């Protein structure tokens, strides 16, 4: 009968509405206010995340990060006040604590541009879209440490660039000769003997770019060919 069908639909609608209301009541009203910063790494094969951050701090300073951290503290106080007034205090308190992520307050999103095409009136047109490839999360403490270190060197370059310059300065003529004698003027890969020093290179076993230091234990003799092959890897 029509009455029974109408009742059936009313019951279904009622159940759906109750479900929506229950979901609305019990879902978390808290969303952590992350600060997102986007880096375009198109054309960069293996960008160093800390270098990206250093460049950003050199150009923009640290104030926006400090301001956002202050904003997060204000947001927390407002959330705590709402929890105290809520009839679901225990649930809201749990939801609030679960969303707190101060250690990942700042999100650095690395993007690459991709070329795509669409056809309009049989003519192909290209356009670019930015595709996120990686997201890095950090806190104000990490950013402050890097900012302070950059400040000490006058913001003249990234910390890795400064470190590399410092390590290269440590490669003195005396140290070169000491390593050459230690390795008997012999390439440590192919065994070529170079007593006259022609084609002899002093190589960092762990490259400076990867944190290697200019110390005896990290240096070796290589011939020009082997050194070139190693650099190309």
Which residue stretches match the model-derived regions?
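Histidine-centered nuclease catalytic patch
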Residues: 192-221, 232-233
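N-terminal signal-anchor transmembrane alpha helix of single-pass membrane proteins
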Residues: 1-37
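Short, charged surface segments at domain edges that flank catalytic/cofactor-binding sites
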Residues: 141-189
């Amino acid at each position: 009968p029509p009455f029974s069908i109408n009742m059936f639909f009313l019951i279904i609608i009622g159940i759906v509405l109750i479900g929506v209301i229950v979901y609305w009541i019990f879902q978390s009203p808290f969303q952590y206010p992350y600060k997102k910063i986007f880096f375009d790494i198109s054309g960069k094969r293996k960008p160093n995340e800390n270098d990206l951050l250093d460049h950003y701090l050199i150009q923009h300073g640290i104030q926006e990060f400090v301001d956002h951290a202050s904003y997060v503290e204000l947001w927390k106080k407002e959330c705590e006040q709402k929890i105290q007034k809520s009839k679901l205090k225990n649930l809201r308190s749990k939801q609030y604590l679960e969303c707190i992520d101060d250690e990942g307050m700042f999100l650095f999103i690395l993007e690459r541009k991709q070329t795509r095409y669409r056809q309009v009136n049989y003519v192909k047109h290209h356009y670019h879209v930015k595709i996120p490839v990686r997201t890095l999360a950090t806190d104000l403490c990490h950013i402050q440490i890097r900012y302070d270190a950059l400040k000490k060197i006058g913001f003249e370059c990234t910390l890795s660039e400064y470190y590399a310059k410092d390590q290269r300065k440590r490669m003195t003529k005396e140290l070169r000769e000491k390593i050459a004698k230690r390795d008997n003027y012999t390439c440590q890969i192919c065994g070529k003997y170079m007593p006259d020093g022609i084609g002899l290179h002093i190589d960092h076993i762990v490259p400076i770019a990867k944190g290697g230091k200019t110390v005896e234990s990290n240096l070796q003799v290589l011939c020009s060919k082997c050194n070139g092959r190693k650099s190309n890897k």
